Amino acid sequence: MANSGCKDVTGPDEESFLYFAYGSNLLTERIHLRNPSAAFFCVARLQDFKLDFGNSQGKTSQTWHGGIATIFQSPGDEVWGVVWKMNKSNLNSLDEQEGVKSGMYVVIEVKVATQEGKEITCRSYLMTNYESAPPSPQYKKIICMGAKENGLPLEYQEKLKAIEPNDYTGKVSEEIEDIIKKGETQTL
């Protein structure tokens, strides 16, 4: 079932932070693999940015076998995503998942607008030094599943579905394959 609107009007406190996800962490089950405290906060829009996929430092992701999501400034464009309220105890695991220590991504602060028009400040990530590359079919599927699960605007979901993946036909990690299989059986 799709989420809608902000679920928690209190926002972050000294024990928590808000994280704007636009890639594989759109999907609840995916973010909970490493960050169990993540709780849906709301759907939001990042104005004047565009979604892209790439290989950090020209190296293909060994996890996803294709380009992975990033954002870049692009006046007039927008990126939709999910804001998660997370316990600060998950900061290190989130940074680790995003490859901050290896220099794959940098932490950025973004101002996003909720569907109700409220502006909130969130933590997010931006890939540095990357070459554009299409995502694997599995990575694209996880992103599309998350967009649908959380009720991102239908027009944006269609844009995500229209992304051309690479031709990787192998497997990704077992835990991700399990999530994809569950998603496919739920839509039958």
UniProtKB/Swiss-Prot annotation:
It holds the Pfam family AIG2_2. The modification Phosphoserine is found at S173. It comes from Homo sapiens (Human). It comes from the Eukaryota. Belongs to the gamma-glutamylcyclotransferase family. Gene3D superfamilies: Gamma-glutamyl cyclotransferase-like (3.10.490.10). This is Gamma-glutamylcyclotransferase. Induction: By geranylgeraniol. Its EC number is 4.3.2.9. CDD domains: GGCT_like. Homodimer. Catalyzes the formation of 5-oxoproline from gamma-glutamyl dipeptides and may play a significant role in glutathione homeostasis. Induces release of cytochrome c from mitochondria with resultant induction of apoptosis. One of its GO terms (molecular function) is protein homodimerization activity. The active site is at E98. One of its GO terms (cellular component) is extracellular exosome.
